[in-house]
Amino acid sequence: MSDFAKVEQSLREEMTRIASSFFQRGYATGSAGNLSLLLPDGNLLATPTGSCLGNLDPQRLSKVTADGEWLSGDKPSKEVLFHLALYRNNPRCKAVVHLHSTWSTALSCLEGLDSNNVIRPFTPYVVMRMGNVPLVPYYRPGDKRIAQDLAELAADNQAFLLANHGPVVCGESLQEAANNMEELEETAKLIFILGDRPIRYLTAGEIAELRS
């Protein structure tokens, strides 16, 4: 086995492990959600369409080109289009996680969210891990406009909320993207736990210090 093949096999196993962890801990249910990562040769490895994140076969993961051409494995999800849009427009993005996790999806269904940043910072971690979390308007799953909107937002952001749909998070590795997704989900959970109680938000100076 060549060095490249060994790296690819390791990444396949990592994707399967992380996806299974999401499923086992209740971040994903049924066949909802998809993950992807960039391979060293520029191709993309992604979870197949209709697949359960808790029961993936490393050898059947979808491989597609940077242009979206299906190369091998099972058929890729139609949502791979917006994964590709993120990779093309943010060179720091090496992996993408999209889930229908309970708390973030619930947050995406609320009216009156700030489309520029749905989470006003009240803990340091959302600032340190994700920065702003813009809202993408609702479109039917698979609609090309999701990819178009994410492409416009990708350069300056690494976490997004698809209205009435769920979260999308990038990372410089799949593990980092997974960590960022968990931070977003836990922050969304805190928003609902706090409810209408007065929140002590971080000040502009505190946010600037975290970003420096």
Swiss-Prot record:
**Residues reported in the UniProt entry to bind Zn(2+):** 79, 98, 100, 165
**What's in the GO CC field?**
cytosol
Q: Is Zinc there in the keyword field?
A: yes
Q: Which InterPro entries match?
A: Aldolase_class_II_sugar_metab, Aldolase_II/adducin_N, Aldolase_II/adducin_N_sf, OtnC
Question: What is the uppermost EC class here?
Answer: lyase
| GO function term, MF aspect, one | aldehyde-lyase activity
Write down how the cofactor binds this protein: Binds 1 zinc ion per subunit.
Q: What does this protein do?
A: Catalyzes the decarboxylation of 3-oxo-tetronate 4-phosphate to dihydroxyacetone phosphate (DHAP) and CO(2).
Family under the similarity heading: Belongs to the aldolase class II family. AraD/FucA subfamily.
- The name on file for this protein is 3-oxo-tetronate 4-phosphate decarboxylase
The organism named in the record is Escherichia coli O6:H1 (strain CFT073 / ATCC 700928 / UPEC)
**What's the encoding gene here?**
otnC
